[in-house]
Curated annotation (Swiss-Prot):
The gene is ccsB. This is Cytochrome c biogenesis protein CcsB. GO terms for biological process: cytochrome complex assembly. InterPro entries: Cyt_c_bgen_Ccs1/CcsB/ResB, ResB-like_domain. It comes from Prochlorococcus marinus (strain MIT 9515). Required during biogenesis of c-type cytochromes (cytochrome c6 and cytochrome f) at the step of heme attachment. GO terms for cellular component: plasma membrane-derived thylakoid membrane. May interact with CcsA. It is found in: Cellular thylakoid membrane. Its main location: membrane. It is a multi-pass membrane protein.
Length: 428
């Protein structure tokens, strides 16, 4: 029993909770530094050649579960331990403190007043019921009163005692919600061409609604570098009588019916090329060997003596570069320009079709996260509210009225209020 009590004392201590929070913060940073959820062989290949800090190789990364930090056993255990620490702190300190604050403290002897933070006394007339008048004055100013024949107790701001408990509840919900989200959230990266649609399916394999890319714009800096990507998405469903247009751009996701859609990337997915009076829609692929934002494909051109040419493009406006892979000669085809002849074939570029790169995320823990942060903010605000207490005692023998006050925070502000109330009670 003694061991259990000592364990609870240690777990509920502020030092233990802060240590856990620092540990969780550091390991969360590790989770952002090391890519998460990839194939185990990728970690082995990469970190065996370049170990972390020269010590941790690929096999150790997997053994320590650093390839999935947020769902690892030790990370979840630390979250559970922090929840227990916060709950133990609430039951051991905050709730008893609230219960104590709810009980009225009755000061029957003027000697107790001299031990308070603020105290004053003055001679009064016996003909006036000063306790009754003080009671009326304080009630008008929003104080709660417990009154006796020759004394009263008053308090205000008791909600401040609830603040730490609400913050702890919010933190516990946040930790539970985060852990739940790590296991239940789903994320998918999808590239949509202009006019292309995507059906979103729920767990029962029934179509919830469809999204369609109506328009996609790229804003560029004066030097041509991409500044912003903007997608105009149509959400529609005949069954649900749904038809809405929403816009997403980088750092401004769409939140719709439990889904969050982020603007993540873009690409040139297709081109429409006219070759010898025949239209072809050609699908392009990224070519990272040439550059970061370059797409292209290999094509044969020529009516009799066919040759291989590499078609590449690096933006949504063109031009299309045509490279002979043997002699490295280059030609450029501009959008809607006159046809050019390459190896007896006539080519013209009719259309460039960009794609919007979207990340579609379903995270059922989002309501828990919002609730948690709401509680944390409210609890923090409540915690800033001072709990003030005033006691008034009338001594019939000395004809003196004793007034004393106590505050758990902002003593300077309470001192001004106390002096003002004392003067009003004296002159009332």
């Amino acid at each position: 029993m003694i061991i259990f009590k000592n364990l609870i004392l240690k777990i509920s201590s502020l030092k233990f909770a802060i240590t856990l929070i620092i540990f969780i913060a550091i390991t969360s940073g590790v989770g952002t530094f090391i890519p998460q959820g990839n194939d185990p062989q990728e970690y082995i290949d990469f970190y065996n050649e370049t170990p972390i800090f020269g010590l941790i190789n690929g096999y150790q990364v997997i053994k320590l579960q650093l390839n999935h930090v947020y769902t690892s056993n030790w990370f979840l255990f630390s979250l559970i331990l922090l929840c227990i620490s916060l709950a133990a702190c609430s039951f051991r300190r905050q709730i008893p403190s609230l219960k104590a604050a709810l009980k009225w403290t009755d000061y029957k002897n003027e000697k107790r007043f001299y031990k308070l933070q603020l105290t004053t006394n003055y001679k009064v007339s016996q003909d006036v019921n000063h306790i009754l008048k003080a009671d009326s004055l304080l009630r008008k100013k929003g104080w709660s009163i417990s009154k006796f024949e020759n004394r009263l107790s008053a308090r205000k701001g008791l909600v401040g005692k609830l603040g730490p408990i609400i913050v702890h509840i919010g933190l516990i919900i946040l930790l539970i919600g985060s852990a739940y989200g790590n296991f239940s959230s789903q994320s998918k990266e999808q590239y949509l061409r202009l006019g292309e649609s995507l059906d979103l399916i729920n767990e029962n394999k029934n179509s919830k609604f469809t999204i369609k890319l109506n328009n996609f714009l790229i804003e560029r800096e004066s030097d041509g570098k991409p500044k912003q990507f903007i997608s105009y998405l149509n959400f529609f469903s005949e069954e649900q009588h749904l038809n809405e247009i929403k816009t997403t751009q980088v750092n401004h996701p769409i939140r719709f019916r439990g889904l969050t859609i982020y603007q993540a990337d873009w690409s040139v997915s297709n081109i429409v090329l006219e070759i010898d009076s025949v239209l072809y829609q050609l699908k392009l692929k990224p070519i990272p060997e040439i550059g970061d934002q370059i797409w292209g494909l290999l094509i044969e051109l020529g009516r009799e003596n066919k040759k291989n040419y590499l078609l590449t493009i690096d933006n949504e406006n063109g031009p299309l570069k045509v490279s002979n892979i043997k002699d490295f000669s280059e030609m450029f085809i501009y959008l809607n320009d006159d046809p050019i002849e390459i190896n007896s074939s006539k080519l013209s570029l009719k259309k460039i079709i960009p794609s919007s790169g979207l990340i579609i995320k379903n995270d059922p823990s989002i309501p828990f996260i919002y609730l948690a942060f709401t509680l944390i903010i409210l609890g923090t605000i409540f915690s800033l509210i001072p709990t003030n207490q005033i006691w008034i005692l009338f001594n019939e023998n000395s004809n003196k009225l004793f007034v004393g006050g106590l505050s758990n925070r902002n003593l300077l502000g309470f001192k001004k209020e106390f002096q003002k109330l004392s003067d009003e009670i004296k002159n009332n």
